[in-house]
Amino acid sequence: MNDPQLNNLLKWGIQNSDASRNDPSTAPQPLSEVDKEALQQLIAGVRGPSDADLMQDSFQVIENNEATAEAKHQAFENFEQLIQGIDNANNMEALGLWTKLIKQLESEDPVIRKWAAWCCSTAVQNNVRSQERLLVLKNAIPTLVRLATSDPDKTARKKATSALSSAVRNFQPGLDAVLEHMPAEHKPKEALDANDMASVDILINKLRESI
């Protein structure tokens, strides 16, 4: 072992082992700040990257112009699986990933647009905190409405419709924003109640039937 910090950790571990603690002549030795840092790094290495690290890694691939389309699609699939956990979905804001995600809705690649809409849907489903975040993001709702009503790729339209469905249920401000940007031919004539699933379905089913 050539790393001095790891050598110090090993020495500290031996000194503070059960055998040493049972020896009256051996007093426990505290870790120095440098050794504490080394211990944290060692533990992190054993545990592997955190979900936050993996989420950021996914977007490094997605935003890499040199990455293949296949690699980007796989990165998006990995990201979508991660944000199925509500804590990870809520952590998107702190990691600065919401703005990056919305930007991908404008991708020239229809598969990327599909995945971006899919991830929006996953993040906001039954999650009022993420619903609120999507609402205030510039162009997020208008872009999803445009994709749901006019994207040339049917799969992207379906996922955008799913994202709108998740964004408005039990969240009246989101429903009001979607209706505000909805083209007239897709907008129901009656008033809609976000807390009434049958009411919301009037809008969502109308969108799905148009695909």
Curated annotation (Swiss-Prot):
Region Disordered, residue ranges: 12-31
Major localization class: cytoplasm
Keywords, sorted A to Z: Cytoplasm, Repeat, Translation regulation
Electron transport keyword on record: no
Domain of life: Eukaryota
GO molecular function, one term: adenyl-nucleotide exchange factor activity
InterPro entries reported in the protein's UniProt record: ARM-like (IPR011989), ARM-type_fold (IPR016024), Hsp70_NEF-Inhibitors (IPR050693), Nucleotide_exch_fac_Fes1 (IPR013918)
One Gene Ontology term from the biological process aspect of the record: regulation of translation
Places the protein is found: Cytoplasm
Pfam families, A to Z: Fes1
ARM repeat coordinates: 27-67, 86-125, 129-169
Polar residues composition bias: residue spans: 12-29
One GO CC annotation: endoplasmic reticulum
Role played: Functions as a nucleotide exchange factor (NEF) for Hsp70 chaperones which accelerates the release of ADP. Required for fully efficient Hsp70-mediated folding of proteins.
Family: Belongs to the FES1 family.
Name of the protein described by the UniProt record: Hsp70 nucleotide exchange factor FES1
Gene transcribed to yield this protein: FES1
